[in-house]
Amino acid sequence: MKKLTKTHSHRQQKLASIINEALIEILRRGKMLDTRLFDCPLTITKVIVTADLKIANCYFLPFNTKLTIDEIMDALNNSKNAIRNFITNKINMKFSPDIRFYYDHGFDNAIKVAHLLKDL
């Protein structure tokens, strides 16, 4: 019988937690980041690490910013090496995972559902 939900190993969850905390810290400090991120408050909503621990998918949500999602993605990708180096110093592993950033559509989807329910 197949499992309906995908479970993550303890190592995946632990690494995701460490990466999440490191991302929050480096975004708060702002050192070595693209200057466009200085006035762009971001929330890291979740981090999902692949089973082989080589890729960390990081989902973010911006608040009160004049930048577009594409500009924020570009700024995060420009800062990716500095972020990855910072994370490498936080973890004790042979390899540091590749960091990939994605806009979290969860909030937008929740608003759409709320509007649909309101219209019923």
From Swiss-Prot:
* Gene3D superfamilies the UniProt entry points to: 3.30.300.20
What is known about its subunit structure? Answer: Monomer. Binds 30S ribosomal subunits, but not 50S ribosomal subunits or 70S ribosomes.
- List UniProt keywords, sorted A-Z: Cytoplasm, Ribosome biogenesis
Pfam families the record matches:
RBFA
Q: Which GO terms describe its molecular function?
A: ribosomal small subunit binding
Q: Which family does it belong to?
A: Belongs to the RbfA family.
Q: Which GO terms describe its cellular component?
A: cytosol
Query: Which InterPro entries does the UniProt entry name for this protein?
Result: KH_dom-like_a/b, RbfA, RbfA_dom_sf, Ribosome-bd_factorA_CS
Predominant place of localization: cytoplasm
GO annotation, biological process = maturation of SSU-rRNA
Q: What is this protein called?
A: Ribosome-binding factor A
User: Record's NCBIfam families?
Assistant: PRK00521.2-2, rbfA
Spell out the subcellular localization from the entry.
Answer: Cytoplasm
Q: What is this protein's function per UniProt?
A: One of several proteins that assist in the late maturation steps of the functional core of the 30S ribosomal subunit. Associates with free 30S ribosomal subunits (but not with 30S subunits that are part of 70S ribosomes or polysomes). Required for efficient processing of 16S rRNA. May interact with the 5'-terminal helix region of 16S rRNA.
